[in-house]
Amino acid sequence: MTPEEFRQSLAGQGLNLTDEQMQQFELYYEFLVETNKNLNLTAITEKNEVYLKHFYDSLLLALTVKDLQTEELSLCDVGAGAGFPSLPVKIAFPQLKITIVDSLNKRIKFLQELTQKLNLQDVHFHHARAEEFGGKRSVHRERYDLVTARAVARMSVLSELCLPLAKVGGRFIALKAQKSDEELKNAQKAIEVLGGKVIADYATELPQVHDERHIIVVAKEKETPKKYPRKAGTPAKSPIE
């Protein structure tokens, strides 16, 4: 997907990017690939692939969950890595207030430099484990309208890391490359225990390559019990299932 195809495909979905926004995506690509020579941020570095499998893939979130396009929402991106999905969404919809949490300080430094280069406002960074960031004494607990994760971890694990950060009435949104009904079924207990309820499971695909994508939306209906999330590493080792 060339940058022009990226722009046209989004325009076909009602998302019209300005020349300035296209320039921001170009700078993002250049800085990502340059930094990736010394810091392992992504295995995808070919330009057309980055535009499709990182930038467009991230924007599927806003094309699916449409209030992201117009509302001034607070969004916490857990384990953002090289900034996906939150920073492409921020470029397209600058009114969003973004908080990024990542456990690797080198990635946080890359993202801080990147947002300065792109002149993005209202983006905050935290070098932390998600289990600590959403812990019972954390000021970030139950604070965000939306919490996102674009990760391979199981839904039961992601739910324990992300749901404590969503405010009651907010949502946790998981972006999954593949989704098995069994994985979602196994996560039901965790989602319920943590105060959530699955309200949507959108099946979509990347254009051109037709790779399957799932966007799973979990509503935060009640407060997460204080004992969750458990200490760092425990959710992955022994998920609530």
Curated annotation (Swiss-Prot):
SUPFAM superfamilies according to UniProt: S-adenosyl-L-methionine-dependent methyltransferases
Residues annotated as binding S-adenosyl-L-methionine: G79, F84, A130, E131, R150
UniProt GO molecular function: rRNA (guanine-N7-)-methyltransferase activity
Family annotation (InterPro entries): rRNA_ssu_MeTfrase_G, SAM-dependent_MTases_sf
Sequence intervals crossing the membrane: none
EC numbers for this chain: 2.1.1.-
Recorded GO CC terms: cytosol
Any one Pfam family match given in the protein's UniProt record, by short name: GidB
Keywords, sorted A to Z: Cytoplasm, Methyltransferase, rRNA processing, S-adenosyl-L-methionine, Transferase
Predominant cellular place of this UniProt entry's protein: cytoplasm
Localization per Swiss-Prot or TrEMBL: Cytoplasm
Similarity-based family: Belongs to the methyltransferase superfamily. RNA methyltransferase RsmG family.
Function: Specifically methylates the N7 position of a guanine in 16S rRNA.
Protein name as catalogued: Ribosomal RNA small subunit methyltransferase G
Organism: Ligilactobacillus salivarius (strain UCC118) (Lactobacillus salivarius)
Gene, per the UniProt record: rsmG
